[in-house]
Each structure stands twice: as C-alpha cells, then as structure tokens.
Amino acid sequence: DVFQTGRGRPWGEHHECCFCGTERFFRPAYAGHLLDEWIPAMEGVEDKLKKGAKVADIGCGLGTSSMLMAEQYPNSTIHAFDFHGPSIDEAKKRAAEKGLDNLEFFVSDASAIPNESYDLACIFDAWHDMGDPVGVAKSIKDTLADDGTFMVVEPMALDGLKNNIENNPSSSMFYGFGTLICVPASKAQPIGLGLGPQAGPKKLMGLLSEAGFSSVSLAAETTSNLVFQANK
C-alpha cells in the first residue's frame, strides 16, 4: 500500500523492534566518533560545551547521543526532543539509570522546539526522515543564540548516484533502509520531501543554505557519517 499510494508510513507504525534496532545500529558510530571527532571538528563549539552551553538534540530517539553529551559535558544543559512518545519514555528511563541531572527529554515535533537561545542544536541521522527538512532547519535557526550552531549528522553518502554506488560501500545498505523506512516516514508527513539517507553533501549543504544559515560547511566525515556545521 505504501508503494501503491505514495502516502508513506509514519515512523510510529513500525514494530517496536525498529526503534531499539535503529538505536543499536547507530550507537557504535556515536560512541566512537561523537565526542572524539565530530564535536571537536565543529569550530567554536567544544569550548562552549566545556564551559556550559544550552544544547538541543532534535530527533533524539532513545537518547544515545543526548546521554553521551550530557556525560561528557556536565556543565552544559541538554534538552532532547522526539515526536515519538514511546522512544522518549525509554530514553527517560535510560537517563535516570545513569543519574544525568543535566539532561531532559521532551515529546515534540522538530518544527516546534521552544526558543531557548541554544548554543548548539543537533540532529543525528534523522534530518532526512523529516517531511520538510528546510522548514525544520528554519525553525531550528530561530531557536539558536546569535552565535549558535546547527550540527547535522547524516549517513555517509557521496554526490552522484553512480559515484555513490561505486565508491561508498555503505550505499546499498542505506538505499535499502531509505526505501523501507526513511522515505516512507518522510512521505507520511506534511510536504513529504522524501530526501532519503543518501542525498549527498552537495544536496544537504544546499538545503541548509536555503534555510538561511550564514555559513555552511562539511566539518567532518567518517566511514559512517557526514557532519555539517551551519552557523546562524
């Protein structure tokens, strides 16, 4: 029915194993790269986090990225958001077990994040799942402090379909994920762009520029991910 109608399939309609399975899939990359490579590559960000910054983690799922940042930067306050209530419930349980008092979780759509003048807003492997990624980026821009940064982490992809298939070993896997999960999730939302997890850096940076950020750059890349920095 999803393929016949093009209406998509909402994220919340998947079996619950999809949610914990997605977290388990991405966890090794976050544990291995987020604190040691990705954040240090973001110009001006790590010093703020060490001193004490306000951070929004949007589309946080079960909260792995949120908890890693909360543990590493105890002087900072992390607000984590996801529109999927059951995932937020599980994230709260996991954070409570770790005793993280600088981390709060909220059920919220990505385009409805409160304006808290965040120093850093992040989306990890979820921007492409959103029906209106440009609209979300514009909304996030409005929640940032004047010198705030938007960090977008997306699955590794190369520009150009042929180039990506031939030279990116993970492309076939992510095209499969995108067909079954990511694109249908996006199509089930307003606008329904259907960006997919293999858009490539040129397309993604173009969307961030379209959202009105003053500067956009590819800050880091690892075998698993692309990391973009967009400054307000």
Regions found by a protein language model. Name each.
Residues 1-53:
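Conserved Class I S-adenosyl-L-methionine-dependent methyltransferase catalytic core
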Residues 59-63:
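Class I SAM-dependent methyltransferase "Motif I" SAM/SAH-binding loop
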Residues 134-146:
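A short glycine-rich, Lys/Arg-flanked "PGG" loop and its adjoining helix->strand segment in the class I
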Residues 211-232:
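Core SAM-dependent methyltransferase catalytic element
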Residues 54-56, 66-111:
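Class I SAM-dependent methyltransferase SAM/SAH-binding core
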Residues 108-121:
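A short acidic, Gly/Pro-enriched loop at the edge of an enzyme's catalytic core
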Residues 119-133:
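A short SAM/SAH-binding and catalytic strip from SAM-dependent methyltransferases
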Residues 153-210, 217:
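C-terminal alpha-helical "lid/dimerization" subdomain adjacent to the S-adenosyl-L-methionine
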